[in-house]
Swiss-Prot record:
Species of origin: Rhizorhabdus wittichii (strain DSM 6014 / CCUG 31198 / JCM 15750 / NBRC 105917 / EY 4224 / RW1)
Keywords from the named record: Ribonucleoprotein, Ribosomal protein
Name of the protein this chain belongs to: Large ribosomal subunit protein bL35
GN (gene name): rpmI
GO BP annotations, alphabetical order: translation
GO cellular component: cytosolic large ribosomal subunit
Top-level taxon of the source organism: Bacteria
Ranges in coiled-coil conformation: none
An example Gene Ontology molecular-function term: structural constituent of ribosome
Signal peptide: none
Family: Belongs to the bacterial ribosomal protein bL35 family.
Length: 67
């Protein structure tokens, strides 16, 4: 059986934590931020943990892990 490939988009966008959760960056931070208030920009800084419903699918696309 051939080796399974990791989806390249998943490699770029997600990281696995030590406990098995999936971290991702928050969307909507690239441009046109002048129309958002400071609280929106501040709270969407950094990364967040992916929802449990989506975690299984991301792990399917990365069969050998992400780190």
């Amino acid at each position: 059986m051939p080796k399974l490939k990791t989806k390249s988009g998943v490699k770029k966008r997600f990281k696995l934590t030590a406990t098995g959760k999936v971290k991702h960056g928050v969307a909507g931070k690239r441009h046109r931020l002048i129309s958002h208030n400071s609280k929106y920009i501040r709270t969407n800084r950094g990364t967040t943990v992916l929802a449990e419903a989506d975690t299984a699918r991301v792990k399917l696309w990365a069969p050998y892990g992400l780190n």
